[in-house]
Amino acid sequence: GIFSKLGRKKIKNLLISGLKNVGKEVGMDVVRTGIDIAGCKIKGEC
């Protein structure tokens, strides 16, 4: 009925927001690593 539809929507939204948060954190790690590598290459410290 109505409740199961609402429940499914809520679970879906939670999953989506969870994935977005994980994506953000992974993205930040990748960006940081990329900056570190770029920085050490510029300085010639790799």
UniProtKB/Swiss-Prot annotation:
Pfam family, one: Antimicrobial_2
Subcellular location: Secreted
Domain of life: Eukaryota
A single GO BP: defense response to Gram-negative bacterium
Tissues showing expression: Expressed by the skin glands.
Disulfide cysteine pairs (residue numbers): C40-C46
Coiled coil: none
Recorded GO CC terms: extracellular region
Annotated keywords: Amphibian defense peptide, Antibiotic, Antimicrobial, Cytolysis, Disulfide bond, Hemolysis, Secreted
Family: Belongs to the frog skin active peptide (FSAP) family. Brevinin subfamily.
Function: Shows antibacterial activity against representative Gram-negative and Gram-positive bacterial species, and hemolytic activity.
Name the record gives this protein: Esculentin-1
Species whose genome carries this gene: Pelophylax lessonae (Pool frog)
